[in-house]
């Protein structure tokens, strides 16, 4: 495993990759009635707006809500961010590599 994470945490984090794989499949197939399809069809403006809205909701919960509410809103924010990343051909692993490169410890 990783020096920072136990094996359960690594499996939990691996779900972000699985989620992006699913979102990429939605992007390729664009099934009718899918919320993810609706986001892709709305273009960058719609996706960016949703990332912004969900980020604000997460901030509000961080300031005034419970940890469970904060986690819920952060999950929405991450989902919408992954949709936006996918639309730009960027993988969540690209963000992990960037963060790892910045880590000096």
Describe each PLM feature range.
Residues 1-74, 78-105:
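Flexible "arm" and connector segments at domain edges
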């Amino acid at each position: 495993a990783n020096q920072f994470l136990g094996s359960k945490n690594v499996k939990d984090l691996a779900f972000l990759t699985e989620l992006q794989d699913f979102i990429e499949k939605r992007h390729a197939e664009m099934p009718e009635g899918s919320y993810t399809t609706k986001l892709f069809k709305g273009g960058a403006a719609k996706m960016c707006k949703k990332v912004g809205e969900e980020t604000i909701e997460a901030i509000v919960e961080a300031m005034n809500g419970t940890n469970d509410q904060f986690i819920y809103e952060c999950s929405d924010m991450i989902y919408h961010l992954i949709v936006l990343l996918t639309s730009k051909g960027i993988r969540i692993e690209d963000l992990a590599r960037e963060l790892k490169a910045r880590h000096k410890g």
